[in-house]
Amino acid sequence: MLKNRIIPCLDVKNGRVVKGINFVDLKDAGDPVEQAKIYSDGGADEICFLDITASKENRDTIYDVVERTSKKCFVPLTVGGGVRGVEDINKLLNCGADKVSINTAAVQSPEMIIESSKKFGSQCIVVAIDAKKNGDKWEVFTHGGRNNTNIDAIEFAKKMEDNGAGELLVTSMDRDGTQIGYDNDLMFKISSTVNIPIIASGGVGNLDHLVDGIRLGNASAVLAASIFHYGTHSINEAKQYLNSKGIPVRI
């Protein structure tokens, strides 16, 4: 049986890990390289590293931080933020990223997902979908959650799978930073539509939320930031808790 993954997320702004509520009121939660090492040593299955200002300000991801992080991290590292083309993906993989997360560019240039999955393999192409509920549907947002595309998130998820994405990182913008749990309706709708793994993101406040993301949202992996950054729970505590609930994890 496949093990469910626990993934701490490092949102980075100006070279520092930050965690805000709904992408706006950011608080400083430490140095990304040191945080990554703590998580790597602490049993994280993967680490997600997102430069949350890169797309908005149209600047390159901080390659040196990625490189230093990868040297201290001995678990798979997913890196995103400011990825605009195949060359950016190539640079990130060369800096030590195992997977590259693509958000804004996947909407603006869907063919880039086809090209990059052919060139590098679908296993290292993650499409990040930031979605917000509007009536009875969810819409895709880009540029760090600032621009509404009016694109249906469920349809977009299927299109990205068809284009060659190996995984989807699905963030509920309504839940991000709120600590009230994932939007499991959104997660379940996407996971029921595609045959590739989805990572649930946005809203974790306690360990039961991780359980719900897997059981109710049908996610293959659960991502969280605040509960790990501020020491509410360790990765090991999260794994032991999921294990106690009968959810297969790597202990």
Swiss-Prot record:
**Organism, per UniProt?**
Pelagibacter ubique (strain HTCC1062)
Catalytic reaction(s) noted: 5-[(5-phospho-1-deoxy-D-ribulos-1-ylimino)methylamino]-1-(5-phospho-beta-D-ribosyl)imidazole-4-carboxamide + L-glutamine = D-erythro-1-(imidazol-4-yl)glycerol 3-phosphate + 5-amino-1-(5-phospho-beta-D-ribosyl)imidazole-4-carboxamide + L-glutamate + H(+)
Which InterPro entries does the record match to this protein? Aldolase_TIM (IPR013785), His_biosynth (IPR006062), HisF (IPR004651), IGPS_HisA/HisF (IPR050064), RibuloseP-bd_barrel (IPR011060)
Record-stated family: Belongs to the HisA/HisF family.
Q: Which residues does the entry assign to the active site, renumbered to this chain?
A: D11, D130
SUPFAM superfamilies, alphabetized: Ribulose-phoshate binding barrel
**What HAMAP family does its record include?**
HisF
User: What name does this protein carry?
Assistant: Imidazole glycerol phosphate synthase subunit HisF
Q: Is Lyase a UniProt keyword of this protein?
A: yes
Which EC number applies?
4.3.2.10
Instruction: List the NCBIfam families hit by this protein, alphabetically.
Output: hisF
Pfam families with a match to the protein in the record: His_biosynth (PF00977)
Keyword entries, A-Z: Amino-acid biosynthesis, Cytoplasm, Histidine biosynthesis, Lyase
Q: What does this protein do?
A: IGPS catalyzes the conversion of PRFAR and glutamine to IGP, AICAR and glutamate. The HisF subunit catalyzes the cyclization activity that produces IGP and AICAR from PRFAR using the ammonia provided by the HisH subunit.
- Single GO cellular component annotation? cytoplasm
GO BP term (any one)? L-histidine biosynthetic process
Q: Any coiled-coil ranges, and where? A: none
Q: In which pathway does it act?
A: Amino-acid biosynthesis; L-histidine biosynthesis; L-histidine from 5-phospho-alpha-D-ribose 1-diphosphate: step 5/9
One function term, GO molecular function aspect: imidazoleglycerol-phosphate synthase activity
The compartments listed are: Cytoplasm
Q: Which Gene3D superfamilies did the record assign?
A: Aldolase class I
Assembly and interaction partners:
Heterodimer of HisH and HisF.
Keyword Amino-acid biosynthesis carried by entry: yes
